Amino acid sequence: MTSSSTSPSSDRRAWIMLIVLTMLTTAGMTVVLPVLPFVVLRYVSNESDLAVWVGVLEAVNGLCAFLIAPFLGRLSDRFGRRPVIIVAALGAAVSMMLFGIGGALWVLLLARVIQGATAGDLPALFAYLADITPPEKRAQRFGLLGALSGIGTMVGPAVGGLLAAISVELPVFLTAAVSFVIALLCIFLLPESLRPENRIASIRVADLHPFAVFREAFGRRELRGLMIGFALLALPFGMFVNNFSVMAYDSIGWGPTAIGLLIAAVGIVDIIVQGALLGVLLPRMGERAVIVSGIIGQALGLAALALVASVLAQPWVFIAGSLLLAAGQGAAQAAMDGAMSNAVGADEQGWLGGATQSLNAAMSTVAPLLAGALYAVVSHAAPYCLGALLMVVAAVVIARARFTDAARLPRAASPSAVDAAA
């Protein structure tokens, strides 16, 4: 396909909406992170069961996302990115309202089911970015979008931790409000990015089965190594995210405010790495070297956290390990997103988003259960030791994976709604 030009004003409008939606989405998702264990703690009879129940709630969320992600991805390829983003935002608003109202563990479980079943906003936003970006610029722009996510990650937990001093439910209700605002912005201001000629003609039933999506994605030579690496990265990072607040509470006695401030610092690191450093590193090192370097950083960060959970329960080690892990994840994920996006065509960006979201959801189903079980039964350090080992394996896989040369890829036609806005 050949590219057509877009006016500076229409391109600027699309970018402004991407910036606003990405920051609001990540801020809304992360506001609740510092308070999640403390909300759950109200409904468990034994505090020692906290890690297990947090794991169960996140696993339910991941399982539902795993089952529905291929459908949402293909919907965005058929009807556009905008409807999927709207549905995801409304689903998040409803689920967070239920979670805040609570009353029993089954209500919290229902809320996570709704959240997982409508979790298509970030993949659709990244597909939107791929629609309006030429292949050779995708890795860098995914890095910029990751930096915007970092701003949301910085603001969300800090606000959540501060509001928790008033009520642990208040950040949850704030998340619901932010999600509703996102839906309104999409309805009234977001232009569609996917041109009619780049949409698929129909949706095959086979495309909606998550295992069928995996079979096709892992069956492609240009995607196989990247998808394996993606899974190996997602599992340990998922264990970290879902066990982070519990370990901070158990090992160094932190409450919601301190946890929220550290997650905000993680967001600052994301901004620096993805917003500034990647623009310098990618042209000099290439995607493969950036990904491998990021993986090594994550492995070292997880090793530091294992020390905190076992023999060195010092806040400075916990902070250093978390920030190193965040820096490595930010670099590796942005470069990985760009590499995978370049491996498929313009009419498959939604399919790819559904495939990676489904794979990430599968890991998000396994990760909290595995982390909770290892943490409660084996040792507090076990999830982080396993995570560091998996990172080493991921580095080897990515070092041998096939990468597509972006310069050889055709450019997608520019988005129709963006053209119409000119």
Residue map of PLM features:
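Juxtamembrane intracellular "pre-TM" segments in multi-pass secondary transporters
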Residues: T2-R12, P191-I228, S416-A422
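Short amphipathic helix-loop junctions that connect adjacent transmembrane helices
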Residues: V35-A51, N242-I259
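Central cavity-lining transmembrane alpha-helices of secondary-active solute carriers
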Residues: V56-L72, A264-L277
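Conserved MFS/SLC helix-loop-helix module at the cytosolic interface between two early adjacent transmembrane helices
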Residues: F66-G103
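Helix-to-loop junctions at the C-terminal end of transmembrane segments
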Residues: I68-F79, V273-E287, Y375
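C-terminal ends and interior cores of transmembrane alpha-helices
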Residues: L90-G103, G297-L312
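Cytoplasmic helix-loop-helix junction between adjacent transmembrane helices
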Residues: A111-G150
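Helix-loop-helix hairpin linking two adjacent transmembrane segments in secondary transporters
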Residues: L148-F188
